[in-house]
Design a protein with these regions (language model features):
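Anion-binding (especially nucleotide phosphate/pyrophosphate-binding) glycine-rich loop
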Residues: 2-133
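Hydrophobic alpha-helical segments and helix pairs
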Residues: 116-118, 122-162
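Residue-level detector of conserved catalytic or cofactor/ligand-binding positions
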Residues: 161-169
C-alpha cells in the first residue's frame, strides 16, 4: 500500500488527475490481464520521470516504467508499487534530414509510418509491432528479419538514478 504522503508528493509533480489509485493493469496491457497497481502515474515529460524516480528511490517505494503495455504480463494480484506510464504525452516524432527522432512513448507503428512518409527506410519491420519505441529499444524488438539494433544510432536514457545520458549502440 502506498502512503498518503507519497501520493500527495506525486500530485505535486504531475497533475492530480494523472495519479490513479488501485488502477486495474488489465486496462493498460495488450493482453488485457492484470490486477490493480497500488498507483499508476501518467507521465507527461522527461522532467517528471526524473523527479518521480528520484523521489521514489529516496522514500524506497518500488516502481516500474511501462509504455503501451504490449507483451506485458501482470499478475492477477496486481503490482505492489507504482507504475509509471510513458505514453502518448511523450510520443513526439520528428524527422530531420535522413534521421528520425522519437520519444519513448511513440508507437513503433507510428514511427514506421513517419519514416515511410519521409522516404526513410529500415523501419518497415516495425509497422506491425504494437509496442512503443522506448520498449522496442530496450528489448531490441524486431520482426521479418529487421530489429531495432539495425536502425538505432543514438539513445537518450533516463536511468534509475535519474541521470540522463546519451549512448550510441
Amino acid at each position: 500500500m502506498i502512503s498518503a504522503a507519497v501520493i500527495e508528493a506525486l500530485k505535486e509533480i504531475v497533475p492530480a488527475d494523472k495519479v490513479l489509485l488501485q488502477e486495474p493493469m488489465k486496462l493498460h496491457t495488450t493482453f488485457r490481464i492484470g490486477g490493480p497497481a497500488d498507483c499508476l502515474v501518467y507521465l507527461e515529460n522527461e522532467e517528471q520521470l526524473c523527479k518521480i524516480q528520484k523521489y521514489l528511490r529516496l522514500v524506497d517505494v518500488p516502481y516500474t516504467v511501462i509504455g503501451n503495455g504490449s507483451n506485458l504480463l501482470v499478475s492477477d494480484q496486481g503490482y505492489a508499487g507504482i507504475v509509471l506510464v510513458v505514453g502518448k504525452h511523450m510520443s513526439r516524432i520528428e524527422v530531420r534530414d535522413c534521421y528520425l527522432e522519437a520519444e519513448a512513448g511513440a508507437l513503433m507503428s507510428q514511427v514506421a509510418k513517419a519514416a515511410k512518409e519521409h522516404g526513410l527506410t529500415g523501419l518497415e519491420f516495425a509497422a506491425g509491432i504494437p509496442g512503443t519505441i522506448g520498449g522496442g529499444a530496450v528489448m531490441n524488438a524486431g520482426a521479418y528479419g529487421g530489429e531495432m539494433s539495425q536502425v538505432v544510432t543514438t539513445v537518450t536514457v533516463v536511468n534509475r538514478l535519474s541521470l540522463i545520458h546519451i549512448s550510441e549502440p
